[in-house]
Amino acid sequence: MRVVLIVLDSVGIGEMPDAHLYGDEGSNTIVNTAKAVGGLHLPNMAKLGLGNLDDIPGVEPVKPAEGIYGKMMEKSPGKDTTTGHWEIAGVILKKPFDLFPNGFPKELIEEFERRTGRKVIGNKPASGTEIIKELGPIHEKTGALIVYTSADSVFQIAAKKEIVPVEELYRYCKIARELLDEMGYKVARVIARPFTGEWPNYVRTPERKDFSLEPEGKTLLDVLTENGIPVYGVGKIADIFAGRGVTENYKTKDNNDGIDKTISLMKEKNHDCLIFTNLVDFDTKYGHRNDPVSYARALEEFDVRLPEIIQNLKEDDVLFITADHGCDPTTPSTDHSREMVPLLGYGGRLKKDVYVGIRETFADLGQTIADIFGVPPLENGTSFKNLIWE
């Protein structure tokens, strides 16, 4: 038996009860995107029950639905990729990741400069493409590293590969990771951001690399691999979990490549396993850029390919589709939004047309997957296997 778990990165379905604490009242990524484009055409997700979860223009409720459907609330504080994926896998954060709206503390930067032997410029929240345009010429002259953050818990280092070779940049990222951990700063990811080209037309290269914090507890991935069930990551899964519990990981260029790689794994791996896929374009390419038209198109493109995924399920396989947070492209904010996420499920062993309700934590999904595989339970979450299993 195989479980295929697909995370549509940032595809939220309505504000959490505490959204006002995050400045996210009124956010509803799917519904507001549908309104902005005069309706979404998502017939395949509609068949599974998506339209039964909210009033989504263009996506009709279907009775009886062919799948199981519900929504999940986030129990952890935060609204980022790491927090969301860890919680899906059973780890609930007690304390949110540290954010640096005014840049990183002086003593941290000074120690980083000492250990790397290079000066730091920037040290503020910024868009990655803007800051290299602003500071690239100084970096080229002096060899100083461009350090910046964002609305997420990230320490990003940008350098031109002709000035700082990529392997050297990775070494500086490892230094930053060790230093943050030593000094007790809880930063989700240190990210290497190499670029090339000439000012003002610098381009970022594909050698981006994430140095993630390890999950703060045992995840579904750890429990499965410890019990001899491999986990195949597609997209940035290995980065999110700092490589822990991921048997093999397949990097992706874009959503379609992620779907292709997921289907290849379904064709190739005929043993019990978890295929865990993150499709990130919704978030990085369209949500943060407040582009509801392209966001809608990406949702429709995924929906067109959903039947291919379903055709490659064997009789006892299970498919789950969910998200990790919101990123409403119609609100003034370009940041993530604190939202509930949709949950859709389908498989030969699952009942049809079952509403699993609004789950209190994303961890209910991880716990259910552990239950389906018959491995020891996770620390958090309540399994709903009994509601959905034939």
Swiss-Prot record:
InterPro entries: Alkaline_phosphatase_core_sf (IPR017850), DeoB (IPR010045), Metalloenzyme (IPR006124), Phosphopentomutase_DeoB_cap_sf (IPR024052). GO terms for biological process: 2-deoxyribose 1-phosphate catabolic process; 5-phosphoribose 1-diphosphate biosynthetic process; metabolic compound salvage; nucleotide metabolic process. It is found in: Cytoplasm. Mn(2+) 1 binds at residues 9, 324-325. It catalyses: 2-deoxy-alpha-D-ribose 1-phosphate = 2-deoxy-D-ribose 5-phosphate; alpha-D-ribose 1-phosphate = D-ribose 5-phosphate. Pathway: Carbohydrate degradation; 2-deoxy-D-ribose 1-phosphate degradation; D-glyceraldehyde 3-phosphate and acetaldehyde from 2-deoxy-alpha-D-ribose 1-phosphate: step 1/2. Mn(2+) 2 binds at residues 283, 288, 336. Binds 2 manganese ions. Its EC number is 5.4.2.7. Keywords: Cytoplasm, Isomerase, Manganese, Metal-binding. Its cofactor is Mn(2+). It is an enzyme of class 5 (isomerase). Isomerase that catalyzes the conversion of deoxy-ribose 1-phosphate (dRib-1-P) and ribose 1-phosphate (Rib-1-P) to deoxy-ribose 5-phosphate (dRib-5-P) and ribose 5-phosphate (Rib-5-P), respectively. This is Phosphopentomutase.
